[in-house]
């Protein structure tokens, strides 16, 4: 591969050779654009729109349109896209990922493809990681778009429905990944079509694309409503778990991020909860609470995974170190942490709607992204999103010096060396950005520096409000900034003249992250636009990466060398061991994301069907034909499922059939068994259908045509929403227990696909049954009002969607259990069809 790259160039270099002629055309139009009057720019926009309407393609007008934006930016905000930024713009327009280093002006680059694609009138979404960046970028670039005659909006967390509709109605809309995703879900929960805010998803430019499409890919967006379960059991499980002894009663698997009881722990659980067999299916509720309490107490770390603020548990984003206000762990883990920390335990929520970022962003007609670091994940971008990564050349050569890692035996020795390094460089006034992996480590380092008399700023989840301000000063002379991981990402660190002379920004990594990309992001904060700078990572054998995934050989070598805890080794072997540990973890995480996507694709296809059907109900003026189809399906399916063809049982089956339909849509005694006992199955269907349709026609006359159409819409929306919410729960429970199928030599993914499909078919049938039942039993006193079946109480990120424990709903009959009615059939083939 290396030899081929030398001969033909890398993939990016080959692709850039195709882009260069387009960029040459853009640059050649520079003089022409400079000669335009200010009022001509809006006229050019109208001209482009007209050309597109007449059949020209976006690529036909691209060189001229890009040249126009370039001149507009120069006149309005004093910034003119340089060649490399034009290349980046073309790459984004082509629906690819442009890898652009920090400080290369990604915000300005986005104006080029955003303008061109907005000319179609279908809207463009520019996605950032937080509200601050969305508003900042919109405010910075709005003058450019407005000068060109385009409208630009921004979606922020606190906007109401009307403001959101206005922002989405703009030509270009800035916003965060979570706001775009949640608005999509909310749009599919509205009861009037006028309440929807988003248009059809057209073109998206995702800033920090690796953070959103890879780091957060396992994070479903969840809109929750209030659950009914009591919270008392969380406290009981917490009390039990705190009485256990590590290793003896339970073990922790750090790689899987989980904890489980040993045989001795199981015995203790049986005694404590007074049950005979802890593993019994009827004790799943106990198992679930114990597993979550174990995880809360022994796996989840305060000030690393979560923090406490004003008596509330806040999730800390592991990638940015930011506190995620208003987000809760799902599946009872948040409640278990609340019980552990002795704060008020909130009720477990019910999922009303959910989607992952993977599936949300794959719905756009065209998707593109920008980031400083994407190449290490190129395979994943290509395989999951169909996006290739093109490395955009930097405007100035990178002058940053990346030093080799230094490795210490103990964490204590490592931090002593870090402090010594900081003190040494502080003396000469060199600014430093020190990256840590947790709030706890930030604060430990901070107290060590205080003892040495080194003034510094701490940037972590606890001080999120000051984030951008602190980061903007990090390049000043003598400034020391400690930051959790990627806090402050998206804000440039600009050097002062004195800081430049002192050596530029020094990056100190206090630990290697499990992803090389996150390390590269930290490094990339220094050396922007050809600035001087330096970086070095300090590693100890006690760090999580080395301890969990590192090689025992390294530990052996260090032991043989007899190193003191503050002695360092710099060795190629150690560096390559670190890299191979990172590759191992990256591969493992990619596999997890791929597997999760296979599971999520099942419910994603189902979601698309339900949301499409729901949309048709909202949009359609007349549901009469749809309702008549439902009536026919209910009657025909009832006949098919009740009549087995066994002569001796025929009379009984007919009576059961009549009873069943009387419960749904037949008035009592309208059809008697003797009326249909001499008919064939097909004749029975026609006779029953005729009777039911006559009642429907009578009801329509009685209520009035206009009003019954609205009643049908109200009923169908309520039934679809209720059944879909229950189905989400059912699919989640199926997924939680599906891993055990591997013990039966079954492929869990295939089993999930098959059973999930069966459950979906059942749900669709039950939607028809309930819709017909409610419609035939409706009594009208006043015009029906549409209302949501459940009230949204919160939005959520589920940080731990892997290896959840099954929860048992009280007194729930399994689909494959024998039906309690005594028919001798399985529940799913008997009363389960009617449930």
From Swiss-Prot:
User: One short Pfam family name for this protein?
Assistant: SEC-C
An example GO biological process term is: protein import
Which residues does ATP bind? 85, 103-107, 492
State the needed cofactors, names only. Answer: Zn(2+)
Tell me the PROSITE patterns matching this sequence.
Answer: SECA, SECA_MOTOR_DEAD
Q: Does the keyword ATP-binding apply?
A: yes
Q: Any note on cofactor binding?
A: May bind 1 zinc ion per subunit.
Q: How does the protein associate with the membrane?
A: Peripheral membrane protein
Task: Report which reactions are catalysed by this protein.
Answer: ATP + H2O + cellular proteinSide 1 = ADP + phosphate + cellular proteinSide 2
- Protein name per UniProt: Protein translocase subunit SecA
Please report the organism this UniProt entry assigns to the protein.
Answer: Clostridium botulinum (strain Langeland / NCTC 10281 / Type F)
Name the gene for this chain. secA
């Amino acid at each position: 591969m290396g030899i081929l790259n030398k001969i033909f160039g890398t993939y990016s270099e080959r692709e850039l050779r195709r882009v260069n002629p387009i960029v040459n055309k853009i640059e050649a139009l520079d003089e022409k654009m400079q000669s335009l009057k200010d009022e001509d720019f809006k006229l050019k926009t109208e001209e482009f729109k007209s050309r597109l309407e007449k059949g020209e393609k976006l690529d036909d007008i691209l060189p001229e349109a890009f040249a126009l934006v370039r001149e507009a930016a120069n006149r309005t905000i004093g910034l003119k896209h340089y060649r490399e930024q034009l290349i980046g713009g073309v790459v984004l327009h082509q629906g690819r990922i442009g890898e652009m280093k920090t400080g290369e002006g990604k915000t300005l680059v986005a104006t080029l493809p955003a303008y061109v694609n907005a000319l179609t009138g279908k809207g463009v979404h520019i996605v950032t990681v937080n509200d601050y960046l969305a508003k900042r970028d919109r405010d910075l670039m709005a003058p450019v778009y407005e000068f060109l005659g385009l409208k630009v909006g921004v979606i922020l967390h606190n906007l109401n429905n009307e403001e959101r509709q206005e922002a989405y109605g703009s030509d270009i809309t800035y916003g965060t990944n979570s706001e775009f995703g949640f608005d999509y879900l909310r749009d599919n929960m509205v009861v009037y079509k006028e309440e929807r805010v988003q248009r059809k998803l057209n073109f998206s430019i995702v800033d920090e694309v690796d953070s959103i499409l890879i780091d957060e890919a396992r994070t479903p967006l969840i809109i929750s409503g209030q659950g009914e379960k009591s919270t008392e059991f969380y406290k009981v499980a917490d009390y039990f778990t705190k009485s256990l002894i590590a290793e003896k009663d339970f073990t922790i698997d750090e790689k899987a991020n989980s904890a489980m009881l040993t045989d001795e722990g199981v015995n203790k659980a049986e005694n404590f909860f007074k049950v005979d067999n802890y593993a019994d299916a009827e004790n799943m509720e106990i198992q679930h609470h114990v597993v979550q309490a174990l995880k809360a107490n022994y796996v989840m770390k305060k000030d690393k995974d979560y923090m406490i603020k004003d008596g509330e548990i806040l999730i800390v984003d592991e990638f940015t170190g930011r506190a995620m206000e208003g987000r809760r762990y799902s599946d009872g883990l948040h409640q278990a942490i609340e019980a552990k920390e002795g704060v008020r335990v909130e009720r477990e929520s019910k999922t009303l709607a959910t989607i992952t970022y993977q599936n949300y962003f794959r719905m756009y007609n065209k998707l593109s992204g920008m980031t400083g670091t994407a190449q290490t994940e190129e395979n994943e971008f290509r395989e999951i999103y169909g996006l290739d990564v093109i490395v955009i050349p930097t405007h100035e050569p990178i002058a940053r010096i990346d030093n080799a890692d230094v490795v210490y035996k103990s964490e204590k020795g490592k931090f002593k060396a870090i402090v010594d390094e900081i003190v040494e460089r502080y003396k000469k006034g060199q600014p430093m950005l020190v990256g840590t992996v947790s709030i706890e480590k930030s604060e430990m380092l901070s107290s060590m520096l205080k003892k040495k008399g080194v003034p510094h700023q701490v940037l972590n989840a606890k001080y999120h409000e000051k984030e951008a301000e602190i980061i903007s000063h990090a390049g000043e002379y003598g400034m020391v900034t400690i930051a959790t991981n990627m806090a402050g990402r998206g804000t440039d660190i600009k050097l002062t003249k004195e800081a430049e002379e002192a050596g530029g920004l020094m990056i100190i990594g206090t630990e290697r992250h499990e992803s090389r990309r996150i390390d590269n992001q930290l490094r990339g904060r220094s050396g922007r636009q050809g600035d001087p700078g330096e970086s070095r990572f300090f590693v100890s054998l006690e760090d999580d990466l080395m301890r969990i995934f590192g090689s025992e050989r390294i530990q052996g070598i260090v032991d043989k060398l007899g190193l003191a805890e503050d002695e360092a080794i710099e060795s190629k072997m150690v560096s390559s061991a670190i890299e191979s540990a990172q590759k191992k973890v990256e591969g493992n995480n990619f596999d997890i994301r791929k597997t999760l996507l296979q599971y999520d694709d099942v419910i994603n296809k189902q979601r698309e069907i339900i949301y499409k059907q729901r949309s048709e109900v909202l949009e359609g003026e007349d549901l009469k034909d749809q309702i008549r189809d439902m009536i026919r399906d209910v009657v025909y399916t009832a006949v098919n499922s009740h009549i087995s063809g066994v002569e001796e049982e025929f009379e009984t089956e007919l009576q059961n059939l009549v009873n069943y339909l009387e419960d749904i849509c037949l008035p009592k005694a309208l059809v008697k068994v003797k009326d249909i006992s001499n008919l064939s199955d097909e004749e029975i269907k026609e006779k029953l259908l005729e009777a039911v349709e006559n009642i429907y026609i009578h009801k329509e006359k009685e209520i009035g045509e206009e009003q019954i159409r609205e009643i049908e819409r109200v009923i169908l929306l309520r039934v679809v929403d209720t059944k879909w919410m229950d189905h989400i729960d059912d699919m989640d429970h199926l997924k939680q227990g599906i891993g055990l199928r591997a013990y039966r030599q079954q492929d869990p993914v295939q089993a999930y696909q098959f059973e999930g499909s069966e459950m979906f078919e059942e749900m669709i049938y039950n939607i028809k049954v309930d819709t017909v039942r409610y419609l035939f039993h409706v009594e009208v006193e006043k015009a029906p009002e549409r209302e949501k079946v459940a009230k949204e109480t919160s939005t959520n990120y589920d940080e731990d969607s892997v290896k959840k424990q099954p929860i048992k709903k009280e007194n729930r009959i399994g689909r494959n259990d024998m039906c309690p009615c005594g028919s001798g059939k399985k529940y799913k083939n008997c009363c389960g069809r009617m449930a």
